[in-house]
Amino acid sequence: MIVGEDQLWGRRALEFVDSVERLEAPALISRFESLIASCGFTAYIMAGLPSRNAGLPELTLANGWPRDWFDLYVSENFSAVDPVPRHGATTVHPFVWSDAPYDRDRDPAAHRVMTRAAEFGLVEGYCIPLHYDDGSAAISMAGKDPDLSPAARGAMQLVSIYAHSRLRALSRPKPIRRNRLTPRECEILQWAAQGKTAWEISVILCITERTVKFHLIEAARKLDAANRTAAVAKALTLGLIRL
């Protein structure tokens, strides 16, 4: 049986979605790039929409733009006049780049951005806006002649949403659970914060110095601290111990 184009794109997208939660960032990005490339998209970017308070570099989650284009885009502050992210901020619907509204005569700066993009092989593109409680973002992909059929666009939307969500989750700092340290570890860190040596703590608590050192090492490991001093500092910051 010959698989139709719609079914093919649907299958590829679902296979990607099924694998997302098992992938770490490098493997996820590699699979995402491979999938969009099969659709004719040779470049992409996943980023928050720039604002007065934050520029594109610090908002970028994954950058697949040509290096020279990204550098030019940032140095020329193209995000301030680019019709694609401008339109993305006002809609929840994915759209083709050429459908982003602007007037060539009244908005020559916007036209210049699109013209310069084409010089880097980014002739036509597809943008998927995403709006979260903490801000807006977009996945924008482009190429010289990408497949923009409804089936391909639907697949690109689906994989982009899942890829962005997974990368956002992976980029968040892993929270330290307040209850990870045992009462004994907290007690020993409390004494360490007061400047007591391992031997002095062992005398105070009537345990061996070796046991004290073991608990200090375990506490540092759980707090992702490089040494005893860093562990004490982090425990104080988290409110696990007090001076």
Swiss-Prot record:
Q: Which InterPro entries match?
A: Sig_transdc_resp-reg_C-effctor, TF_LuxR_autoind-bd_dom, TF_LuxR_autoind-bd_dom_sf, Tscrpt_reg_LuxR_C, WH-like_DNA-bd_sf
Q: Keyword set for this entry? A: DNA-binding, Quorum sensing, Repressor, Transcription, Transcription regulation
Domain HTH luxR-type, residue spans: 174-239
CDD domains for the chain: LuxR_C_like
Residues the UniProt record assigns to the DNA-binding region sit at 198-217
Any Gene Ontology biological process: regulation of DNA-templated transcription
Lipid biosynthesis: is it a keyword of this entry?
no
Query: SUPFAM superfamilies given for it?
Result: C-terminal effector domain of the bipartite response regulators, Pheromone-binding domain of LuxR-like quorum-sensing transcription factors
One annotated GO molecular function: DNA binding
**A Pfam family hit:** GerE
Keyword presence, Transcription regulation: yes
- Name the source's superkingdom: Bacteria
Q: Which family does it belong to?
A: Belongs to the autoinducer-regulated transcriptional regulatory protein family.
> Its function?
Responds to the quorum-sensing autoinducer 4-coumaroyl-homoserine lactone to regulate expression of several genes. Represses expression of rpaI in the absence of the inducer.
Q: What is this protein called?
A: HTH-type quorum sensing-dependent transcriptional regulator RpaR
* Annotated source species: Rhodopseudomonas palustris (strain ATCC BAA-98 / CGA009)
**What gene is it encoded by?**
rpaR
